[in-house]
């Protein structure tokens, strides 16, 4: 039987596990090679067919995997190995025998470099700890750390070692690659302390290390540069601007092909329709606007505009200071009282932005002794707040079953515990199961923070958000949000117990050391809350629009995941097809967001549609027709009835 190196086997195994996790919703850590796909994991034949096709394409197999041959993940792995290496039997990885010194040397180097990229003390990094779920080190940091390891060890290969779960697994893969490229003797010398400048962190190795050069890419006539935005994160190069130069070439190519259209400027108020300057075509065009988060249409309400104008005349343009020095205005205090009352809490603190609210709150209340449990698809401001705090992040899969397993695993942790979740998930549109989450928090002694950025003004009888939606108003420890969406202003806030809010005012750096929102903005948000509560018909109209449009899209066969809010995703998956889909939609006069990495994971690309109360039934019908026609143009699946509708409309035209 042919031998397969540890590196080859481990890399393939982790890639296969990652693909199964991505397409089934499991965490990689929850998947066993020997679990029966249908009986143990509930993977049906339809899902398995998608996985088999994805793996066959991923590994460019001449003979595709057949679902009848796959009962376990190991069956799929063995099938790939047999096709890749023409093996006649199933294989196990060949072990690499290293001396204790060499193994210790490489393990210490891996820990040292990962410590520098993650903020951990090197002594806190256990080799057998799960990189993501135990240590909370994200994929961007992993890629950056691996890049430094490749440069430090002067490895020829530029291929990132895919998805090793632990530092120990990564160490094994590096060992195999080192033995292959440099030989066993070189490796053993390192372990005996006979290191060269390539692994001397105190030496200046810039002149000796040849930076990796960009691998030539085949430019496809349609997609152009085949890279994704993920490929420009953590590029190792002596010039820190190198990644920017590379990205510029990539971005200009995408703009030229009208695939990227980020930052198109508005030339009129943003309502159900808006005029924008289309930089790709050089035209001033009116679009159906489905990219606005002004869910209740308050951003153009005359009463709110007048409130902003009056406050500017009375208090000036801005306060030019932070709140605890000379930046507080009576309107800030009034706004905090209104927000606290809306949420049913004692007090409220207003931050310069929703992003800074998450950063400031999480970093002030947690430290390295504490655990923060965060949903894998939480907003980036939550993830960054966890990093800034230095607390141990425990990322759970987008499932409360996954959260429960993680809480149970760390039930005896002596430090504090905080569960952080979006109320409405910003790129997916689904709503957290708050009652179940609160029961888990109570059982395991954890506090809860809910980010209501896309819930306030959308969920609940009065628009108060997630807790009101579940009749749990005032029961969540911390309710956080932004005023830049339904409330049509700017800034973020946290509502909670009075003593907790008081603590945040003095220990939340993004509040203490930052200028606050201008008084006119505060006046506008105060007016927005008043109008929202006084005109409940806006919320009723919003939900009428959501139900109508969502039903039409579902009947057409679009994949909307579990959306149940004003955010409706149309999930495509493939980046290139999603970019073409977005281009076709925009060409027909509809503006919505085309979301690829880093907004979502690579392979989870989508269009993101935002519904507002300002949309008319005619707007929704026209948008539906545009989406169906565009989907048919680029090959996004729709069902037969939608296809017939499109043919009929074309015939009438």
Swiss-Prot record:
> Which domain of life does the UniProt lineage start with?
Bacteria
Q: Which residues bind pyridoxal 5'-phosphate?
A: 354-355, 426, 454, 482
Chain positions with N6-(pyridoxal phosphate)lysine modification: 485
Q: Give one Pfam family, short name only.
A: Aminotran_1_2
The modified positions for O-(pantetheine 4'-phosphoryl)serine read 45
Please give an example of a GO cellular component term from this record: membrane
Q: Which GO terms describe its molecular function?
A: pyridoxal binding; pyridoxal phosphate binding; transaminase activity
Which SUPFAM superfamilies would you find in this protein's record?
Answer: ACP-like, PLP-dependent transferases
**Phenotype when changing residue 45 to A:** The pyrrolyl-beta-ketoacyl moiety is formed
Query: What CDD domains does the record point to?
Result: KBL_like (cd06454)
- Could you say which residues bind substrate here? 379
Which InterPro entries does the record match to this protein?
ACP-like_sf, Aminotrans_II_pyridoxalP_BS, Aminotransferase_I/II_large, AON_synthase_class-II, PP-bd_ACP, Ppantetheine_attach_site, PyrdxlP-dep_Trfase, PyrdxlP-dep_Trfase_major
Associated pathway: Antibiotic biosynthesis; prodigiosin biosynthesis
Q: What membrane topology is annotated for this entry? A: Single-pass membrane protein
Result of knocking out the encoding gene: Cells with an insertion in the ACP domain of this gene show an white phenotype and produce 2-methyl-3-n-amyl-pyrrole (MAP) but not prodigiosin. Cells with an insertion in the aminotransferase domain of this gene show a light pink phenotype and produce less prodigiosin than the wild-type.
Domain Carrier, residue spans = 7-84
Give the required cofactors. pyridoxal 5'-phosphate
Protein name, please?
4-hydroxy-2,2'-bipyrrole-5-methanol synthase PigH
Species assigned in the record: Serratia sp. (strain ATCC 39006) (Prodigiosinella confusarubida)
């Amino acid at each position: 039987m042919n031998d397969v190196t540890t590196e080859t086997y481990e890399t393939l195994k982790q890639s296969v596990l990652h693909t199964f996790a991505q397409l089934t919703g499991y965490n990689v850590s929850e998947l066993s090679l020997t679990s029966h796909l249908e009986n143990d994991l509930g993977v049906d034949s339809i899902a398995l067919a998608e996985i088999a096709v994805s793996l066959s394409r991923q590994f460019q197999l001449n003979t595709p995997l057949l679902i009848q041959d796959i009962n376990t993940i190991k069956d799929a792995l063995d099938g790939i190995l047999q096709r890749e290496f023409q093996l006649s039997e199933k294989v196990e990885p060949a072990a690499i025998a290293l001396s204790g010194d060499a193994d210790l040397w490489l393990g210490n180097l891996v820990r040292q470099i990962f410590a520098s990229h993650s903020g951990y003390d090197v002594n806190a990094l256990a080799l057998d700890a799960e990189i993501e779920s135990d240590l909370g080190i994200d994929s961007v940091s992993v890629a950056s750390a691996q890049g430094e390891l490749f440069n430090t060890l002067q490895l020829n290969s530029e291929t990132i070692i895919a998805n090793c779960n632990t530092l120990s697994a990564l160490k094994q893969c590096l060992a195999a690659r080192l033995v292959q490229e440099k030989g066993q003797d070189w490796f053993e010398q390192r372990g005996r302390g006979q290191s060269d400048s390539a692994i001397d962190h105190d030496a200046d190795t810039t002149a000796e290390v040849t930076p990796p050069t960009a691998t030539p890419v085949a430019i496809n006539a349609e997609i152009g540069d085949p890279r994704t935005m993920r490929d420009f994160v953590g590029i190792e190069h002596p010039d820190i601007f190198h990644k920017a130069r590379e990205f510029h070439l990539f971005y200009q190519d995408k703009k030229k092909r009208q695939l990227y259209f980020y930052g198109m400027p508005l030339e009129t108020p943003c309502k159900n329709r808006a005029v924008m300057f289309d930089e790709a075509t050089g035209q001033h065009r009116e679009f159906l606007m489905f990219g606005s988060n002004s869910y209740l249409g308050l951003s153009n309400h005359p009463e709110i505009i007048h409130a902003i104008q009056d406050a500017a005349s009375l208090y000036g343009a801005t306060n030019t200071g932070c709140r605890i020095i000379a930046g507080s205005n009576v309107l800030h205090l009034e706004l905090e009282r209104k927000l606290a009352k809306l949420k049913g809490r004692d007090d409220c603190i207003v931050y310069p932005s929703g992003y800074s609210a998450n950063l400031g709150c999480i970093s002030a209340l947690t430290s390295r002794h504490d655990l923060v449990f965060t949903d894998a698809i939480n907003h980036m401001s939550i993830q960054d707040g966890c990093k800034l705090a230095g607390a141990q992040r425990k990322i759970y899969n987008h499932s409360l079953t996954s959260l429960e397993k993680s809480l149970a695993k760390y039930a005896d942790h002596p430090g504090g515990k905080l569960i952080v979740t979006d109320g409405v998930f910003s790129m997916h549109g689904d709503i957290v199961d708050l009652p179940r989450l609160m029961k888990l928090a109570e059982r395991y002694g954890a506090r809860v923070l809910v980010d209501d950025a896309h819930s306030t003004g959308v969920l609940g009888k009065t628009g108060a958000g997630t807790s009101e939606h579940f009749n749990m108003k005032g029961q969540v420890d911390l309710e956080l949000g932004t005023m830049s969406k339904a409330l049509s202003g700017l800034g973020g806030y946290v509502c909670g117990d009075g003593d907790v809010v008081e603590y945040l005012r003095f220990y939340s750096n993004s509040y203490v050391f930052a200028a606050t929102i201008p008084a006119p903005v505060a006046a506008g948000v105060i007016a927005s809350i008043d109008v929202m509560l006084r005109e409940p018909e806006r919320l009723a109209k919003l939900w009428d629009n959501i139900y109508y449009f969502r039903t039409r899209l579902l009947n057409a066969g679009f994949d909307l995941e579990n959306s149940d809010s004003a955010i409706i995703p149309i999930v495509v998956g493939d980046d290139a097809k999603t970019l073409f889909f977005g281009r076709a939609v925009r060409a027909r006069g509809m503006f919505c967001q085309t979301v690829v990495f880093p907004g979502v994971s690579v392979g989870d690309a989508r269009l993101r549609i935002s519904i507002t109360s300002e949309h008319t039934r005619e707007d929704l019908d026209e948008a539906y027709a545009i989406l169906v026609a565009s989907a048919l143009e680029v090959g996004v699946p729709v069902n037969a009835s939608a296809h017939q509708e499109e043919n009929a409309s074309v015939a009438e035209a």
